[in-house]
């Protein structure tokens, strides 16, 4: 079975200033990858390269198909850090925003099947109660949950999420990460997620990927927590992340930090 994401030799620069250098990795079906690293390290740019939203050099395959030939966008749900929908003032309802996530939709009619998908996605994200409200009248946290529903509406096999919990309150964050964990564990949805919230999401993540212009680390949570080499490479950031996992009880059994349970 081909990798869900395969990247080889990715490079990107803004006006000749390197942002990403020689990034290579593979994400397998069923992985839950936490993409971490310092601000300005190229994490968001990397996601945009994978989705064809930025153009760099190197090779990208999605579900075994070269990015330039990839057509099955319904297999991918994407939640950007700054969504164009959030920045637009066009008066659309929350339900209409979710409907936008059906990439295969054509024409003005909405089928019964599409409505069922919208209902299911909004039910999962607890946004059904304000389906008819204007999107921009919602709070920032409510908007974020609607945008998650839009990412889920096509029932994707891969979710790519850029700091999705930033605007959420504690209760919504817990719901959000529990939902992602369930989608990964029970439905086999592959997840690639930029996060600084390693405590709450740490119990679900299976692999960590650390990017700071270059790929510094890619491996399992166990390798991340137990390896002295990782701590030496990443320094204070690694220790902060491991401490966060430890404090929430999500370090693997036998982790050298003492947090395994």
Model-derived features: positions:
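ABC ATPase nucleotide-binding domains
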Residues: 222, 226-228, 232-261
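Conserved ABC ATPase "signature" region
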Residues: 99, 112-130
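Catalytic Walker B motif of ABC-type/P-loop ATPase nucleotide-binding domains
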Residues: 159-162
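Conserved catalytic motifs of ABC-family nucleotide-binding domains
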Residues: 155
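Conserved ABC ATPase signature
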Residues: 134-138, 142
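H-loop (His-switch) and adjacent beta-strand-loop-beta switch element
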Residues: 207-220
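Conserved ABC transporter NBD signature motif
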Residues: 58-72
């Amino acid at each position: 079975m081909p990798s869900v994401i395969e990247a080889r030799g990715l490079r990107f620069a803004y006006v000749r200033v390197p942002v990403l250098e020689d990034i290579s990795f593979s994400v397998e079906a069923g992985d839950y990858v936490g993409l971490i690293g310092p601000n300005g390290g190229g994490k968001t740019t990397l996601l945009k390269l994978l989705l064809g939203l930025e153009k760099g050099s190197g090779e990208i395959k999605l579900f075994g198909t070269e990015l330039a030939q990839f057509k099955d966008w319904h297999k991918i749900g994407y939640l950007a850090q700054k969504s164009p929908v959030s920045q637009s003032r066009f008066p659309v309802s929350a339900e209409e925003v979710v409907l936008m996530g059906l990439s295969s939709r054509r024409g003005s009619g909405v089928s019964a099947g599409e409505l069922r998908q919208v209902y299911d996605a909004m039910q999962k994200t607890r946004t059904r109660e304000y389906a008819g409200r204007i999107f921009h009248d919602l709070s920032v946290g409510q908007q974020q949950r609607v945008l998650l529903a839009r990412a889920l509406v096509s029932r994707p096999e891969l979710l790519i999420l850029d700091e999705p919990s930033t605007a959420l309150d504690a209760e919504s964050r817990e719901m959000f990460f529990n939902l992602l964990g369930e989608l990964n564990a029970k439905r086999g949805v592959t997840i690639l997620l930029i996060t600084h919230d390693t405590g709450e999401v740490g119990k679900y993540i299976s692999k960590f990927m650390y990017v700071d212009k270059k790929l510094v680390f890619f491996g399992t949570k166990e390798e991340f927590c137990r390896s002295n080499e990782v701590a030496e490479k990443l320094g204070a950031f690694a220790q902060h992340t491991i401490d966060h996992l430890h404090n929430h009880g999500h370090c693997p059994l036998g982790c050298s930090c003492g947090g395994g349970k």
